[in-house]
Amino acid sequence: MKSELIFLPAPAIGHLVGMVEMAKLFISRHENLSVTVFISKFYMDTGVDNYNKSLLTNPTPRLTIVNLPETDPQNYMLKPRHAILPSVIETQKTHVRDIISGMTQSESTRVVGLLADLLFINIMDIANEFNVPIYVYSPAGAGYLGLAFHLQTLYDKKQDVTEFRNSDTELLVPGFANPVPAEVLPSMYVDKEGGYDYLFSLFRRCRESKAIIINTFEELEPYAINSLRMDSMIPPIYPVGPILNLNGDGQNSDEAAVILGWLDDQPPSSVVFLCFGSYGTFQENQVKEIAMGLERSGHRFLWALRPSIPKGETKLQLKYSNLEEILPVGFLDRTSCVGKVIGWAPQVAVLGHEAVAGFMSHCGWNSTLESVWFGVPVATWPMYGEQHLNAFEMVKELGLAVEIEVDYKNEYFNTKNDFIVRAEEIETKIKKLMMDEKNSEIRKKVKEMKEKSRVAMSENGSSYNSLAKLFEEIM
């Protein structure tokens, strides 16, 4: 009888890619295993559509893609932003239940487990109904998990965690060797209007799962991983990363060719790459400061600059129609020989290019792992979600990044945004980021971690062995 795992990623590209790549890894490591991935589309994230098409165009044996019915964006337009994604997930539960019901009744298939994204953990009720073991996948790192479990524990003990908001408090958090400043806590955990009680309910349920699979590796987060393992109230931990989509998603191939062609013409280790994720957008005054800082630094650059979502619109915009309207007068002409401003970027291909020597990033966890895999030092510019915590971990805990600023908040996720990072700060940190290995301890450490990341995924490496133990648990 065929063994089948069901994967349930959250409907956002950063969550989806990691789980699909992990499904491919599972299949490659176990010849008697098949995986079915349920994909639900988030109306704001066009990347899900593009990635989904690439999966259907290039099918993987024993990997089945099931597209859940698309939801009407109008159902969510009046909801507060923090409530949109949970609502999208909730509407899919009936469809998920019907499909799982059919799969568990099959005489040719044995469903050995359901692997759900952290945000999909409430699907546990359905798994329990059909006696299917449930496992949790965390697309974020072990440090973030440790903090979230810690805040959930404080909340359950009736401590008002919202008091940490805008405070100078430093927290002693299991999983962090250094005190964690309240200013880097993910805002959704300390905001009474941000759905924090819902988030804590997810981590409470997460404790009931069979195991937690994390996209990280022992050598990157040893302190945080060990802390999670020592907590008897947390299920077994399996670090199996870094899990990355190193082939890209096939979208915008013509644009990618132009960008990579430009990089081919640049000297080795000469370019700083600026890219801030799907929701990483700036107001015009901040764009101008970044431009001035880049120009003053004297370094070659590739800058992925995307516009904010216009009011009344629901989909992400890939590029500006006229860059001259938002950049300083004459900037494009003055920097035409050393820089290129783009919209969408083939991030993995760019980071893997020999011309790229530095990465100014929003510090999403996938981007952080990609920078480590390719050995490219990061200048941290966190904007929303857990990114401030990731930046703190990379800079203070691990010594793998240059800090630009941790107070900036993206206007999409915050109603007030009057903080500006000045050109002088940007210029200084770019120069520090781009120092060569002789003068940069950070660059040396990142190079060492690059090698460790590859060893972790190789035979008998830490993540390789962790996955083998997970198979013993599942099968």
From Swiss-Prot:
InterPro entries: UDP-glycosyltransf_plant, UDP_glucos_trans, UDP_glycos_trans_CS
Record-listed UDP-alpha-D-glucose binding positions: 278, 344-345, 362-370, 384-387
CDD domains: GT1_Gtf-like
Disulfide bonds: none
Pathway membership, UniProt: Secondary metabolite biosynthesis; terpenoid biosynthesis
Functional summary from the UniProt entry: Probable component of the triterpene saponins (e.g. ginsenosides) biosynthetic pathway. No detectable activity toward protopanaxatriol (PPT).
Name of this protein: UDP-glucosyltransferase 102
Source species of the chain: Panax ginseng
Phylogenetic lineage: Eukaryota, Viridiplantae, Streptophyta, Embryophyta, Tracheophyta
